[in-house]
Regions:
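A short, N-terminal "cap"/entry segment at the start of jelly-roll beta-barrel domains
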Residues: 1-48, 63, 133-156
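Conserved short histidine dyad/triad with adjacent acidic residue
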Residues: 35, 52-68, 105
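Short strand-connecting beta-turns/loops that link adjacent beta-strands
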Residues: 43-44, 69, 88, 116-117
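Short, charged/polar surface micro-motifs in flexible loops or helix N-caps
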Residues: 43-47, 57-61, 78-82, 131
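Short glycine/proline-enriched turns and hinge-like loops at secondary-structure junctions
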Residues: 47-49, 67, 95, 114-116
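A short hydrophobic beta-strand segment most commonly corresponding to one strand
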Residues: 53-54, 73, 102, 117-134
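Conserved metal-binding segment of the jelly-roll/cupin
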Residues: 57-59, 85, 95-115, 125-127
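A short beta-strand-loop-beta hairpin characteristic of the jelly-roll/cupin
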Residues: 61, 70-97
Length: 156
């Protein structure tokens, strides 16, 4: 039974599959990356989550940005993600395929494709439906401080 007291029609209210060819590129963008929505209210009926893909071309980087009150999880599928964050993007760490990245609310950050020979491909999950993307004008530090994402993965 649902909250409304009637039995759900699992055929129409159950599992949803969004094909890769059906993702929506009409999302707020940041220079240097391509975002596409896969799971949201419009595509799948999701009420509390947003999920999609992010792509950064070889040897490219995004502009600095943050996502307001939203938490973000990034899963690296292909390539090497170099993340910079902080008031002046003064911290840096890298993630490889299979690694997860957590970006807390309000954190200024930048995604960089650390590879010159292949695109960086990631899956992105956010804690809400709101398309919050605040692009920032930040003067980055010259040499960011390196920080480990996971002590099992050496920096490269």
């Amino acid at each position: 039974m649902t909250k409304r007291g009637k039995k759900p029609d699992w055929r129409t209210e159950g599992v949803r599959i969004v094909k890769a060819s059906d993702v929506d590129f009409n999302t707020p963008q940041t220079c240097g990356m391509t975002r596409a929505a896969a799971i949201n209210l419009a595509k799948a009926g999701a009420q509390k989550l947003w999920a999609g893909t992010v792509s950064v071309q070889p040897d490219a980087k995004t502009g600095a940005h943050q996502h307001g009150h939203l938490e973000s999880i990034i899963y690296v599928v292909k390539g090497r993600a170099r993340m910079r964050w902080g008031e002046r993007l003064e911290y840096v760490a890298e993630a490889d395929p299979g690694d997860f990245i957590f970006v807390p609310p309000w954190v200024p950050h930048q995604e960089i494709n650390a590879r010159t020979d292949e695109p960086l491909e990631c899956v992105l999950v956010r804690s809400d439906q709101e398309p919050v993307v605040v692009n920032l004008d930040i003067e980055p530090v010259e040499r960011p401080e390196q920080v480990w994402i996971d002590p099992n993965h050496p920096q490269g």
